[in-house]
UniProtKB/Swiss-Prot annotation:
Outcome following mutation: C78S: Alters glycosyltransferase efficiency towards a subset of target proteins
Predominant place of localization: endoplasmic reticulum
Protein name: Dolichyl-diphosphooligosaccharide--protein glycosyltransferase subunit OST6
Function: Subunit of the oligosaccharyl transferase (OST) complex that catalyzes the initial transfer of a defined glycan (Glc(3)Man(9)GlcNAc(2) in eukaryotes) from the lipid carrier dolichol-pyrophosphate to an asparagine residue within an Asn-X-Ser/Thr consensus motif in nascent polypeptide chains, the first step in protein N-glycosylation. N-glycosylation occurs cotranslationally and the complex associates with the Sec61 complex at the channel-forming translocon complex that mediates protein translocation across the endoplasmic reticulum (ER). All subunits are required for a maximal enzyme activity.
Compartment(s) where it occurs, according to its Swiss-Prot or TrEMBL record: Endoplasmic reticulum membrane
Subunit structure: Component of the oligosaccharyltransferase (OST) complex, which appears to exist in two assemblies comprising OST1, OST2, OST4, OST5, STT3, SWP1, WPB1, and either OST3 or OST6. OST assembly occurs through the formation of 3 subcomplexes. Subcomplex 1 contains OST1 and OST5, subcomplex 2 contains STT3, OST3, and OST4, and subcomplex 3 contains OST2, WBP1, and SWP1.
GO MF, any single term: protein-disulfide reductase activity
Domain Thioredoxin: 35-162
Pfam families: OST3_OST6 (PF04756)
UniProt KW Transmembrane keyword: yes
Native source species: Saccharomyces cerevisiae (strain ATCC 204508 / S288c) (Baker's yeast)
Gene3D superfamilies for the chain: Glutaredoxin (3.40.30.10)
Name of the encoding gene: OST6
One GO location term (cellular component): oligosaccharyltransferase complex
Cytoplasmic topology ranges: 210-216, 289-302
Length: 332
């Protein structure tokens, strides 16, 4: 019995020693890998450290950007690679600063510097952006970049510089919340500024001088301003925390959602504007025939013109509604 107890104690001591040694080795490997990060949190893969890095780190997401900084054998460079690399480093820096608790490692590998990666992944072109999720604890020893499953980000020239789209892609996979800063778009600002100034000057110089009762006009505008958001879905947008402007994969503004049970914030204003225009045209159609200072022939021409414009706007309204409800039967 005494010898049996001694054997059990020795066996437990050996197991504890092996566990402590393996834990220390794993910790040592993590520390060694983390020291390779640059200022934005990205690790550059070389031919020397590739065997170590390609085995991954337990519990960490591996975000791998495969690029070509120089030229290929034909002397051609990869412009898409250069364009996306700025986006890659920018988003990596945002995640490093805003979500330090997230267990992830960003890697950049140049196919000219690490040809073994090209053979392992059987690459035919560049660039590629892949994300390896952490391996299960019992399968960590089998984890390798060349054999493990991954998520792939679609890289095309249209989204190469879109930090918001790439940040959203990673945030969903890593299950984190980040805010990607956007560069100030001068061209877009000038466009909206000029448009607003034209409308403002037109109202000030043309509309207001002809208004005798300005208080009544402002009261009507205020009433419409309160009424229209209510009937066009402002509360729905507010309750569901829907963003005001949504963009598609090509960074274009989506003015209408593809379903009658959902809407974007911008739809409040687009639908309100269509209601206002059609209401104004209907009112003008009623009052134009009653204008005495205009000849009967001119009143007839104006009425016909307003009717055509109203028909056009209603047809446009129906075409927008078909985006929401493609099965709507009345189309003209």
């Amino acid at each position: 019995m005494k010898w049996c107890s001694t054997y059990i104690i020795i066996w437990l001591a050996i197991i504890f020693h092996k566990f402590q040694k393996s834990t220390a080795t794993a910790s040592h490997n993590i520390d060694d890998i983390l020291q390779l990060k640059d200022d934005t949190g990205v690790i550059t893969v070389t031919a020397d450290n590739y065997p170590l890095l390609s085995r991954g780190v337990p519990g960490y997401f591996n975000i791998l950007y495969i690029t070509m900084r120089g030229t290929n054998s034909n002397g051609m460079s990869c412009q898409l690679c250069h364009d996306f690399e700025k986006t890659y480093h920018a988003v990596a820096d945002v995640i490093r600063s805003q979500a330090p608790q997230s267990l992830n490692l960003f890697f950049t590998v140049d196919v000219n510097e690490v040809p073994q990666l090209v053979k392992d992944l059987k690459l035919q072109n560049v660039p590629h952006l892949v994300v390896y999720p952490p391996a299960e604890s019992n399968k960590q020893s089998q984890f390798e970049w060349k054999t493990s499953p991954f998520y792939q980000y679609s890289l095309v020239p249209e989204n190469a510089e879109n930090t918001l789209q790439f940040g959203d892609f990673l945030a969903k996979i890593l299950n984190i919340s980040i805010t990607v800063p956007q560069a100030f778009n001068v061209q877009e600002f000038v466009y909206y500024f000029v448009a607003c100034m034209v409308v403002f000057i037109f109202i000030k110089k043309v509309i207001l001088p002809k208004v005798t009762n300005k208080w009544k006009l402002f009261s009507m505008i205020l009433s419409l301003g309160i009424l229209l958001p209510s009937i066009t879905g402002y509360k729905f947008v507010e309750m569901n925390a829907i963003p005001f402007i949504a963009r598609d994969a090509k960074n274009r503004i989506m003015y209408f959602s593809g379903g009658s049970g959902w809407q974007f914030g911008i739809e409040i204003f687009s639908v309100s504007l269509m209601y206002i225009v059609m209401s104004a045209l209907s009112v003008l159609l009623i009052y134009v025939p009653k204008i005495s200072c205009v000849s009967e022939k001119m009143r007839g021409l104006l009425s016909s013109f307003l009717a055509c414009v109203l028909f056009y706007f209603f047809s446009y309204f129906i075409s927008c509604y078909l985006i929401k409800n493609p099965g709507y039967p009345i189309v003209f």
